[in-house]
């Protein structure tokens, strides 16, 4: 008999802001940067039950995988209260897996780390950003994959300045590449030039990270835009351009000309993102964008960074 009533878990969405070395020319494959968002989130509650009760298919799949690996019972109820939208570039799969795994870890008192859980759920195979934001939140950098890497190590973590605001541009009619399509797309990409991997690594280390530390939004934005342009052009044969959605591309152009910085697409999209200083400025710009793009399937949302990781709460 458990001594608690339930386990509550919150897992944050994330922006995947790009890779550093897609071909491993510098000795390690991938290497990623990204940031945790205040919303959307995946939120679920786990309670004891006499049988398996899960209405969310993705959560059920994660439950079965976890319980088979650690030889614990699937007789629990998982209520998914909120879920990050699937296949739009916000990390829904990893965050659901980590939310279910972290909740069950607490429920059964297994003492597992977030990385143990991620490896069990086959997360972090290319990027460690989803793991990093669940662990710490904020802006994170992972070191990619070496010969013996299980999950990419976290190399850097910074809190995002409180006044920075992200504008998300979501195309409600489309999804980014995922599953087998994503795997095949990576296989079909041409080699990523070593000189570009060196340049992007330099820009991150000597420009983007100092810019966050010094609250220099303009400089940070320049680097992210350049990194996104470079990686987006490399991915363009697989996704039809730097942006997956032509409507998102048009909206990002409008936002750029009206003062937004750090222009990019998260993961395979179709969601675009940018940064701007201050709530009021961001909301005004979004209101203009909503009018201009009213006849498109676009949705605009202002969010802040989440400078803390996922939450696991034992309720008594």
Enumerate the predicted regions with their spans.
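ATP-dependent small-molecule kinase catalytic core of the GHMP/sugar-kinase superfamily
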Residues: 1-10, 16-18, 24-29, 113-261, ...
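ATP-binding N-lobe of GHMP and related small-molecule kinases
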Residues: 1-90, 105-114, 125, 307-309, ...
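Short, well-ordered alpha-helical segments
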Residues: 57-60, 98, 202, 283
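A structural signal for isolated positions on well-ordered beta-strands in alpha/beta enzyme cores
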Residues: 77-79, 273, 301
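DPxDG-like acidic metal-binding loop motif
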Residues: 90-114, 133-144
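Conserved glycine-rich beta-strand-loop-beta hairpin in the small C-terminal domain of fold type I
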Residues: 270
